[in-house]
């Protein structure tokens, strides 16, 4: 005779594996916009590995390229959050 016991605890899946993604963001407003962009990255991504910003005098759009660790499920939300910022012209995977 065998006796099997099953746990009644609900199944919880393991956290999603984080992946490294490179994101290119183009924005207007110059250097004053960088803190808001970085805040958005850190709120939706887990860790910023690389960050490069190119702001030039007399040029309308500036660019920021970042490499972040993010779960695959949160990637679209991160890109959408960047695009919702009023200073952002575009945000795409690089």
Regions found by a protein language model. Give the residues of each.
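Long, contiguous binding/interaction regions
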Residues: 1-61, 69-94
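Short acidic/polar micro-motifs at solvent-exposed secondary-structure junctions
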Residues: 66
């Amino acid at each position: 005779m065998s006796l099997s016991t099953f746990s009644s605890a609900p199944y919880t899946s393991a956290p999603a594996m984080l992946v490294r993604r490179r994101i290119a963001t183009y924005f207007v407003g110059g250097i004053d916009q960088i803190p808001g962009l970085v805040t958005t990255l850190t709120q939706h991504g887990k860790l910023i590995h690389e960050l490069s910003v190119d702001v030039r005098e007399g040029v309308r759009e500036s660019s920021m390229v970042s490499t972040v660790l993010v779960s695959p499920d949160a990637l679209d939300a991160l890109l959408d959050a960047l695009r919702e910022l009023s200073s952002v012209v575009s945000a795409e995977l690089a």
